[in-house]
Amino acid sequence: MRLFEFAVTLALSSAAFSQQKPEAPRDTGSDLLWKKLETRIEQISARFDGVMGLAILDLTDGTTLLRNADRVFPTASSIKIAVLLELYRQDHQAREGAQGKAKLSDIYTFDPKDLVEDSQIMAALTPRVTRVTNRDLAQFMVAVSDNAATNVLIDRVGMQNVNATLRSLGLTKTLLRRKMIDIAAARRGDENVATPQEMTWLLEMIYKGEALSKELTGQFIKQLKTLKKDSYLSYELPADVELADKPGSLEGVRTDSGIVFAKNRPFAISVMTAYDCDEKAAERAIGEVALDAYRYFEMRGKTSEYGRVLPSVPPGR
């Protein structure tokens, strides 16, 4: 009898053991693929004649690739992301009943005294006749980087409010310190600045809905996708890749910060250059960094952790 009970116990134990899934080994090749990306980025940066800082942030697992990412660079027009964010935040506050906040629906009547250099859309409006909304001004600011539209929005939301919002998000090195095309302010050292790492943090908070409501987050990203001018990140990317970004250019400076929507693996990226001897080379370098990063995330988005390309799931299944 005892022998029979022992045999039954042994059989049951063996059956249970056989049903347990063996633990998978963790030393996969994904870290090697990441190291290859780091090497390629290092090579691009090393052969660039100016100074390059960059941050790449995986929006799926938070992994980051950093090079000179905590150094402060001029943002040029990339700072317009922060202006746009403040406009959206104030619109939300106004909906909640706050007084004195800018709304997306507020009307602006074009005044020619607001014109500055690189204001192609605003310059074509009829003075004291054409009326547009703050949302329209934001579209001019983002889609074609209209500087007059940007300056009007800075006046309406308040430069100090933009900076207060950035500080509230923990971004202490990202600062709006002057309006667009204010050469006197720039000569005083009042440059608009940020670090690549802080720009990716800002984009991550926007993407994850930590800076705006869900509704406004969707509207914000949709508007940032409408860029039609000088996107350096998109230089080498396939035409069908969605990108929400804002580039910037000054003499000797090229920057671009945005979210690249690689399938199943979106990432935030900010590349900033300064002391550029060859500005076209800087633009190409930003495009090369973005392409190498995209290739990595596009591959990770369609493979298992062991590197097998997985078949696509048919729609509806």
Stretches found by the model and what they are:
Residues 113-151, 159, 192:
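Conserved catalytic neighborhood of penicillin-recognizing serine enzymes
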Residues 2-9:
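Sec-dependent signal peptide recognition
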Residues 51, 130, 151-208:
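Mid-domain, small-residue-enriched loop/turn segments at the edges of structured enzyme/sensor domains
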Residues 59-60, 101-122, 157-158, 223, ...:
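Acidic helix-start/capping segments at beta-turn-to-alpha-helix junctions
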Residues 36-69:
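A short, well-structured edge-of-sheet supersecondary motif
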